[in-house]
Amino acid sequence: MIQIFFLGTGAGSPSKKRKLPAFLVRREGVNILLDCGEGTQYTLMNYKLGINSIKIIGISHMHGDHVFGLLGVIASMGLLDRKETLYILGPRKLKDFLYTSFEYSKFNPSFKIEFIDNYNDENITISTFKTCHTIESQGYLIMEKDRVKIDEEKLEKEKIRDWRVIRKLKEGKTVEYNGKLLKPEDYLVIKRGSKVAYTGDTMPCQSVVDSVKGVDILIHDSTFLDEPSAYTYGHSNVTDAAKIALEASVKLLALTHISPRYEDVSEHLKMARRIFPKSILPDDLSYITIK
């Protein structure tokens, strides 16, 4: 199960309704922060979302509305006596940006910071993909690994309740039970892992389509409603995001990075749903669970 908290869904500068981009992805003990706009530390702490429980931070690009909150988050981690390693993914200039800021502010983290290109453990993988913005930028793909589970309904139907037999089946072993050979492949089912994709800032981009095919949720740049100048600034219109979701056969589209010029966003959702019906436009502090 994956939970996604939409901490900030705005763009450029904060508005009364929308803070700057930040998304907290939780997956059974691994908390991932995607982008870190100004004020993210306040949101995390004010709503008790566990700032020190964040293990991995992924930054999409170096524009201020996506990265200016990172120093504050790391400083708060230090003040809270963090000991665990913090893993960071991001553009090439991110490391220099952070350590230069540490030097000028005389801040020395009490914990290890490790810059990585991807992440892999027994439960999830995190990889990046190319996006099309005005500066170096990347999106993120978080994938749960497939899990093998015992078919409990079939066990109950066949009245197999001996825990020793069930354990052997889980271990992939053939076992004899009441004169019958039980083969593990007949009692094990594969639960497909969930997939979450986040684009950061991007114009319509084939590399995005290719990278997010079939994901459970696509969180896509939807800065403008219908502005010809969107591409000049390296952004997408709502209809662009919907067309990409449709072409990539994603299960759910979340429109985000909404320009502060829009107070009423009802038309955004209408336009998106004409093309891709399974579209949502999350408010700040809303969340969604992917099972």
Swiss-Prot record:
Molecular function GO terms recorded: 3'-tRNA processing endoribonuclease activity; zinc ion binding
InterPro entries named among the record's database cross-references: Metallo-B-lactamas, RibonucZ/Hydroxyglut_hydro, RNase_Z/BN
Catalytic activity: Endonucleolytic cleavage of RNA, removing extra 3' nucleotides from tRNA precursor, generating 3' termini of tRNAs. A 3'-hydroxy group is left at the tRNA terminus and a 5'-phosphoryl group is left at the trailer molecule
Superkingdom as given in the UniProt entry: Archaea
Binding site for Zn(2+) 2: D65, H66, D201, H257
A Pfam family assignment: Lactamase_B
Residues holding Zn(2+) 1: H61, H63, H133, D201
E.C. number: 3.1.26.11
Classification via PANTHER family: ZINC PHOSPHODIESTERASE ELAC PROTEIN 1
Protein name stated in the entry: Ribonuclease Z
